[in-house]
Amino acid sequence: MQTDILASAPRTTDGQMLDQNGGTIARSRVKAVYIVPDTGAGSVVFRDGGASGAVKVTLNTLAGATASDYIEFPGEGLLFQTNVYADVTTVASVMIFYG
């Protein structure tokens, strides 16, 4: 099934991922993630349904603010039933591509 791919607004702190206009991203499939790391090693934990929601994936980053990471998920991507919450640690920014 073909779906349009959208890009979220970049997120620099813990919180719900938002679309480019600041709106909520509800049920969706995350197809890819773009992470700009900070100077130290860090991580991004994606949860379904807020700060205490189920962990869908944890992505660890290497130290180095000049080496961004682009990660594509196989198949149809990761399904988030409620919303997409990102818990960022030592990461400059994170952005998702979803549909």
Where are the predicted features?
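C-terminal interaction-tip segments
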Residues: M1-A26, D38, D87-G99
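Surface-exposed coil/turn segments at beta-strand junctions on protein surfaces, enriched
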Residues: I25-A26, T66, L79
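Core-facing hydrophobic residues within beta-strands of well-ordered domains
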Residues: S28-V30, A41
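Noncatalytic modules at the cell exterior or secretory-pathway interfaces
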Residues: K31-V33, E76-T90
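Short, surface-exposed beta-strand/strand-loop-strand elements in extracellular ectodomains
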Residues: G40-V57, I96-F97
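Solvent-exposed serine/threonine-rich low-complexity stretches and specific carbohydrate-binding patches
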Residues: K56-G64
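Exposed aromatic-hydrophobic patches
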Residues: S68-E76
